[in-house]
Regions:
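Extended charged low-complexity segments that act as oligomerization/scaffolding linkers
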Residues: 1, 5-16, 20-23, 53, ...
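Conserved small helical "lid"/interfacial subdomain of P-loop NTPases
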Residues: 3-37, 53-59, 74-85
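Winged-helix-like regulatory helical subdomains adjacent to P-loop NTPase cores
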Residues: 33, 58-125, 137-144, 148, ...
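Structural motif
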Residues: 36-46, 89-98, 146, 177-182
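The conserved phosphate-sensing helix
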Residues: 42-56
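Leucine-rich, amphipathic alpha-helical/linker segments
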Residues: 48-49, 161-199
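Positions within ordered alpha-helical repeat solenoids
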Residues: 56, 60, 105, 156, ...
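Glycine-centered, phosphate/nucleic-acid-interacting loop/turn motifs that mediate DNA/RNA or nucleotide
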Residues: 132
Length: 199
């Protein structure tokens, strides 16, 4: 966007944290210590976003254990931050999960910056907004996931559910998920994880 518009800009590369810096963070937040026993999770925690989301998960009751894998980490974050399993009133975890996935899916399918908030249960939207999982644009009355990583995870969840539903007919599976740019990216991530876990 910037180059074709002849806007002057400079690129700034920001490195992740070092292993020593991650260890220092874990000294201050001992609940994270179990995560650094796994090399792949140490690499993950070099990205400050993952430390922040892990701390949010811990605040919601998550317990990370020595030996947790990247899949365990992701499942724990999904259960405690996105679904927020601790708040079970009115079936809220399932509603939160379904709404978050649907927001990401619709945004990807329609290739829009935001989706009209009026299409979703206002109570669920308010809860996701309170937890800083979605952003509301007051001017356009639209919502979108707040974090790219969580949006990718939501799209992978959508793809996984369609795969389970259509595993007997892979052509229909591929037609159902579509090939929009965000879906294609999420499909590559989903397929990589599938192959990595030999599932």
């Amino acid at each position: 966007y910037l180059q074709p518009s002849a806007i002057q800009f400079d690129s700034v590369n920001i490195d992740g944290l070092t292993t020593d810096q991650v260890a220092q963070v874990c000294e201050h937040i001992p609940e994270l210590t179990g995560l650094i026993s796994n090399d792949s999770l140490t690499e993950l925690l070099k990205v400050p976003f993952f430390i922040e989301i892990a701390v949010r998960a811990i605040g919601n009751g998550a317990q990370f254990r020595t030996g947790d894998t990247e899949v365990d980490f992701r499942n724990t974050v999904w259960a405690t931050v996105i679904s927020k399993e601790a708040d079970r009133k009115s079936g809220m975890p399932d509603k939160r999960r379904a709404t978050f996935i649907n927001i990401a899916k619709q945004r990807a399918k329609k290739m829009l910056f935001g989706i009209r908030a009026s299409e979703f249960d206002p109570e669920v939207v308010a809860k996701l907004e309170e937890d800083h999982l979605i952003h509301r644009d007051q001017r356009s009355a639209t919502i979108s996931p707040m974090h790219d990583v969580l949006e990718d995870w939501a799209l992978e969840e959508y793809i996984e559910s369609e795969y389970i539903e259509n595993s007997h007919d892979l052509v229909n599976f591929l037609l159902t998920i579509g090939n929009e740019p965000a879906i294609s990216r999420a499909f590559r991530l989903w397929l990589y994880r599938k192959l990595k876990s030999d599932d």
